[in-house]
Amino acid sequence: MSTTQAPKRYSPLWVTLHWIIALLIFAAFYLGLSTKDIPLVEKVGILRWHMPLGITVLLLMIVRFVVRWRTPHPEPATAGNALLDKIGEWTHYLIYVFAILMPLTGLVLSATFNLAPVVFGGEGALPRDLSPMLHGLIDPILALLILLHILAALYHQFIRKDNLLARMWYGK
């Protein structure tokens, strides 16, 4: 019986998806936060970019799940501590959940308030404040999870010196 060994790094497709999704999420965060405390007319222009970014993140996250199921990937990194390893595992799961919930709640928000004709067609008016909606409440949770993910990667790279970042980059 032969067993296959897990690869040392993620596939180029996986790496590409990771970094594109990360950039899109940061851009969507920036644009979403830019809509706070500005006139409604200016919000429409920002939402013209923010909404398609969110939909793109959702679609790429679906592709990412398919790639995850169909391609071999490295074993989870270890922090040398069972509790930290479990926190890392759950942080990854929760990032996936919230990275999908964020655009889904954005779509629900858009459908509920019929935002597409307002944002893309210039017909109608935006509601005064959308931030208390579920979409706005998920925002800080996802941001905190991403911050935790980044700090953990830096911990591995510079304190544990296990070259973890090489797993999520191109190379042999």
Regions found by a protein language model. Name each.
Residues 1-172:
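Membrane-embedded alpha-helical bundles that constitute the cytochrome b-like, heme-associated redox core
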